[in-house]
Amino acid sequence: LVMAGVESGRDGHIARNNNCVYVCFIEYTYIGTSRINCNDLCTKNGAKSGYCHQFSEYGNSCWCIDLPDNVPIKVPGDCHLQ
């Protein structure tokens, strides 16, 4: 079976390039000093939707549904702040 033009996506905690998640409170996270809704962050990055995943293994962090493969998600290992 060959499928042409179909993009795959995956669900996961959207991450910055340093493998750090976007920490959220209720539904919002911060990018710099700007407050953004997790759903907006996810959809602006090509996901179908997103929400603040409360009490996850990475704390409260934005979870995206059907995020494109070219957008980083949290992978096992440390968050590299430097």
Curated annotation (Swiss-Prot):
Provide the tissue specificity.
Answer: Expressed by the venom gland.
On whether Iron-sulfur is a keyword of this UniProt record, the answer is: no
| Keyword Secreted appears in the UniProt entry | yes
Q: Which GO terms describe its molecular function?
A: sodium channel inhibitor activity; toxin activity
Which biological process annotations from GO are given for this protein? defense response
The stretch of residues making up the signal peptide is 1-8
Location of this chain's protein in the cell: Secreted
Keywords (A to Z) from UniProt: Disulfide bond, Ion channel impairing toxin, Neurotoxin, Secreted, Signal, Toxin, Voltage-gated sodium channel impairing toxin
Domain comment as written in the entry: Has the structural arrangement of an alpha-helix connected to antiparallel beta-sheets by disulfide bonds (CS-alpha/beta).
Question: What's the protein here called?
Answer: Sodium channel neurotoxin MeuNaTxalpha-3
State the species of origin. Mesobuthus eupeus
